[in-house]
């Protein structure tokens, strides 16, 4: 039985985004006041991210026959992340050099308002490699859950899963309790997702109301260039990877269409994380693979953010007439290979990493961030959408490599078929 169009989450979120854009454009003051609706929805999602990751990873690892399989999955995932994110960085670098959206602007860095980006520059000072690694280790277990730090929760969940697995039959009771708790958490997610249209409406109304459509026109060449690059990356790079793995990127995008709309409305790929964990498992990827790849990907496999970082850095160099020869660009690439891994899937994190990168490279003016401060919020949608698709594709690829992918389940889900061969409407 097909779900009514008006009852589908896809239609509701799309309608809410459209209404939010109209309200923000025609009544900007009212639109700005809608910010709490978007913030509230994202906070509700963040509230359950830590327990979702913990339950998924622990039950996935504890339920595996061999611990070697977990190590193999992690190694394959990290290798994939490094290769694909490097490709994303290089593509961004090539496109921005060909199009040169900042050429001819002739901006004097001394005339830019450095105070506007001072907060980001200060936060960027703590983005070093050692600081990043140390930040993965929580000061306390409770602190990891309280702060919602994905990597800290993931580290504890992996250790807990290993320890529970070693207990064998003695740990069965704990395993059953965590599985039951997981079902309760996903029940909460279903309730929260009913508020997705309200959250998307509030976030979009605020964005358009505060920054205005005029901001899109100003510096529009960079925005258009970035969006086209992200689309090309998804279609050509991720599309080729998907084809080699045995599925269609377009069918996969259709499968996660509701999650993409939620991300479009909130500009944060993190807002779709809980549902992605569930959907990737339903797609045929083993729970242990999903639990490791998706959360880790939110720090190590942000393809959209990688494209953004190279394009934004070179754009600032072009606009301020700063020297960017081949040596400088290779240096930039090497720095970004490290600094880009510190960007979480939340709004604004890419901007902080960009500030850290400009500081590390040295010869690029950090004050140049002021050039893109006004349009960064509009570029975050493309970043978040590309990040989400990239992590979804990564999960399927890794699951296939480690032989933990149910190909029939994948084919049935992407072709909208029930196990008996009958078509059905994807659940929302």
UniProtKB/Swiss-Prot annotation:
Responsible for the aerobic transport of the dicarboxylates fumarate and malate and to a lesser extent succinate, from the periplasm across the inner membrane. GO terms for cellular component: plasma membrane. GO terms for biological process: L-aspartate transmembrane transport. One of its GO terms (molecular function) is malate:proton symporter activity. InterPro entries: C4_dicarb_transport, Na-dicarboxylate_symporter, Na-dicarboxylate_symporter_CS, Na:dicarbo_symporter_sf. The keyword Cell membrane applies. Keywords: Cell inner membrane, Cell membrane, Membrane, Symport, Transmembrane, Transmembrane helix, Transport. This is Aerobic C4-dicarboxylate transport protein. It comes from the Bacteria. Belongs to the dicarboxylate/amino acid:cation symporter (DAACS) (TC 2.A.23) family. It is a multi-pass membrane protein. Pfam families: SDF. The chain crosses the membrane at residues 5-27, 47-64, 77-99, 141-163, 184-206, 219-241, 326-348, 352-374. It is found in: Cell inner membrane.
